[in-house]
Amino acid sequence: MKVLIVEPGKYPREADIEHTLEAEQAVVGGTIEAVYPWRDSACIVCNDNGIAENLPLNRTLGDYDIIHGTFFVCGLTSNDFTDLTPQQMKRYEELYHDPQLFFLLGKTLCVEHTTPEEYTRVMAPPPKTKESPER
């Protein structure tokens, strides 16, 4: 199944995954949840426990939610997931192209579009400091 995989801090990538529950769960790292934010025949498949598992913030979903962890976008039939069309692949790659950084400014959650390199630099754990020898 041709899908668009979107990982935190990375550019989206086109992938061909097996159309099985196990393969879909492997992509998102757990049990799946389908989200239907658009009127066309496409949906987001994400980890349904992303918040509880404290998965990293990934991309905003409109102006009302944030997807946690890796997700993929796939096409829809009347009762199943299917390949994205080339037009859908292009549309959703453009929509989710830029990784996003999330930070608090006071009590306001802010979102900044960034590059994978900048995301890695900002999100890297602080360097370990050399501990002073005990006396």
Task: Label each region the model flagged.
Residues M1-Y11, E18, E134:
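Short, extreme N-terminal segment that most often corresponds to the first beta-strand
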Residues M123-R135:
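Non-Sec secretion/translocation targeting segments of pathogen effectors
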Residues W38-D63:
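Short, structured protein-protein interaction patches enriched in aromatics and acidic/basic residues
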Residues E14-H19, N54-N58, L84-P86:
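Short amphipathic beta-strand/extended segments with alternating polar/hydrophobic composition
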Residues G9, E14, A23, A34-D40:
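Catalytic phosphate/metal-binding cores of nucleic-acid and nucleotide-processing enzymes, i.e., regions
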